Design a protein with these regions (language model features):
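Mid/C-terminal beta-alpha module of Rossmann-like enzyme folds, strongest
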Residues: 140-191
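The catalytic Tyr-centered alpha-helix of NAD(P)H-dependent dehydrogenases
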Residues: 54-58, 92, 126-127
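Conserved sequence/active-site signature of Rossmann-fold short-chain dehydrogenase/reductase
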Residues: 48, 92-94
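Conserved phosphate-handling catalytic cores of large alpha/beta enzymes
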Residues: 75, 81, 86-90
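Conserved Rossmann-fold NAD(P)-dependent oxidoreductase catalytic core, especially the SDR/UDP-sugar
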Residues: 6-64, 68, 74
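Short glycine-/small-residue-rich Rossmann-like dinucleotide-binding loops
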Residues: 3
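A conserved pocket-lining segment of Rossmann-fold NAD(P)-dependent short-chain dehydrogenase/reductase
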Residues: 102-125, 129-153, 157, 177
């Protein structure tokens, strides 16, 4: 999987979101059909559900494209055998740009730890869970489905920051609320 996934960067560079996320998915999906790939697993995001930002919109367009291509193959409108399935993730802990390394670095520097809003919540999963979802979708999918991993209850980001500060043993670290960024939601949806 390759995509731009950072909301602020895509808000500032919408044309790159289209070029990389949408055009990149379209080219790879079309090549999968052309060369007879049996299964195509697209990695999407919870931000594609009722999208409020460029990145979420770009991933929703990708979801629609691969589902449409899958249906066109089933209907005989496109010649091919590729089955297209989609996985939809929340935030993957430990991935590039994850909040955990950011908070660790901010704590190490003595703070402040920056959180956009006191009520912001996010779903999280671990890298092995994300890998498992992709593999399961590739194995179980028959084409056209969107697979969503049960990520449990969403986590309040301020609670995560407070826990990390407490576990660090460092006293007096301030949590600073910076305000929601352009396109950012207070909460994400998975369905």
């Amino acid at each position: 999987a390759a995509a731009y996934k950072h909301v602020p960067m895509m808000e500032d560079n919408p044309e790159e979101s289209v070029r990389n996320n949408v055009d990149g998915t379209r080219v790879i999906a079309d090549l999968a059909v052309k060369y007879g790939t049996r299964k195509f697993v697209m990695v999407s995001t919870d931000k594609a559900v009722n999208p409020t930002n460029v990145m979420g919109c770009s991933k929703r367009i990708c979801e629609i494209y691969v589902q449409s291509l899958d249906q066109a193959i089933k209907d005989g409108k496109v010649s091919g055998r590729t089955q297209f399935v989609t996985t939809r993730f929340g935030n993957v802990l430990g991935s590039n740009g994850s909040v955990i390394p950011l908070f660790k670095e901010q704590i190490k520097r003595g703070g402040p730890v920056t959180v956009t809003h006191k009520d912001i919540i996010r779903f999280f999963m671990l890298i092995p869970e994300a890998c498992k979802l992709v593999l399961e979708a590739g194995t179980m999918g028959n084409g056209g489905e969107i697979f969503v991993f049960d990520m449990g209850k969403p986590v309040r980001i301020v609670d995560l920051a407070e826990r990390m500060i407490r576990l660090s043993g460092v006293k007096g670290i301030e949590i600073r609320f910076t305000g929601l960024r352009d396109g950012e939601k207070l909460y994400e949806e998975v369905l």
